[in-house]
Amino acid sequence: MSNRARAVCVPALLSLGACAVMEPPPLPESDVPQRFIGPVFDEADVWPNTDWWNNFNDEELSAFIEEVKANNFDLAINRRNLASAQLTLREAGLARWPTPELTIGDATSYSRTSLDGATVSRGNENDATQLAATFTYSGILTKPAIYARDLTDYDSELAQSADVAMNTLATATSTFFQLLLIRDRIVAARQNLENAEVIGRIAQARVNAGVSVPIDALQQQIQIEQQRTALQSLIQSDLSARASLAVLVGRHVQGFDIAGQTLQNVEVPRVQPGLPSELLTRRPDLYQAETSLRGAAINVSVVRRTLFPQIKLTASASSSSFELANVLASPAQTTARISASVVQLLLDNGQRRRNIEQAKLFLESSLATYRRTVLTAFNDVEVTLSNIQLLEEQAEVAASSLMAAEEAFRIAEVRYAEGVADFETVLLAQNTLFSTRNAFLDNKLQRLNAILTFYQALGGGWAPGDIPEYWGVTAGGT
């Protein structure tokens, strides 16, 4: 190739490296609804805040979450993974530029001239200092696309870190609620045991008086033992829940406890979603799926550029002298060289074309995965909205049912003591009261967990690029 042709072709090929990478295919319009059809509260905030746990208005919960953020092992690993991803991105950023190399060394030379076996002249040994600098720039056409792919990998890692953090805090909150429910049920179990013992004493008195058969007292004794067993199981569950909370803050269960004793004081907050299209960038898992799609599209560009010639530029400069000071002070004695090579692979048995087809197939699979993730997310929001409304309605039913069950049991107890009602009537009223108490308590936990699930379904207040301060990682990676 002539110098003139090289002067024209090399800049043209270099310009190809700056070409825009392939854009990912868009979502079909039918995948993104115009609005959510589930019931919403008009007076509620749109989208959750990043400190959504404060909305439950429980100071101890808020303090516990702060301790989780500071001491949780999973969050600590999460921070290190993100810091490692930033280092990887910095390395990728440096790889875009020429690779420099600077060397310095000594060289020894000796001269001798012979003629017909006789030494004509003999030189002395000469020690010279050499200083050389080399800059190599290869992969010119593929590096921009490769770096764009590295950026999507970092964005994916950031979204995954946000998802892990949100799920960890949600797990901590849910476990906190579970412990409070267990303590509510312990109180209810003691009430149930007390109620059962009262009926047991009445049944035994009726047997002693000869107005009732012994089987009634025996059946009630079984009920009493069942309530004692249930109470012991709940006490064990309290320990198990405390152990789970202790692990979340990196502590041993010995000496760990929370002051809260009831779930009834925890408020059930309200929140509503915004436009469905906004959810695409608010949920970490959706954003991660989108970055995977972008990465697959960019990878097609990377593989396509293997069809182009491989360009390599090399620039070098060297200087030598018998004294180091002269090497540094005499640039006029420096030898410089610039070279460029263009290599085009002609035959590869179709391997590069097959690689392109594989990259395209992976892109299509990534689009399908993204669409599935998006549809699942939208459906999660709709289902959770409906579930929140259902649980709100059931809360009213559970409260009124509990009042009715308590009154029914009181009447049955009095009538049984007076001999008006039989044992089966009071046994039925007793069992109804026990189950109704548990249903009332369970409804509160279900409502809180439904809101917690809704916060997660809406992304927990996250936005692309957000790095919370408690992660201890500085934003940016280049």
Where are these regions (language model features)?
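Small/polar, glycine/serine/threonine/aspartate-rich low-complexity segments that form flexible
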Residues: 40, 47-56, 66, 104-135, ...
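Transmembrane beta-barrel architecture of outer-membrane proteins
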Residues: 61-63, 84, 128-130, 174, ...
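Short, charged, amphipathic alpha-helical segments
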Residues: 79, 151, 214-222, 423-431
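Periplasmic alpha-helical coiled-coil/stalk elements that build and connect Gram-negative outer-membrane
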Residues: 159-275, 387, 391, 401, ...
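A short glycine-centered flexible hinge/capping loop motif at secondary-structure junctions
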Residues: 207-211, 416-420, 457-461
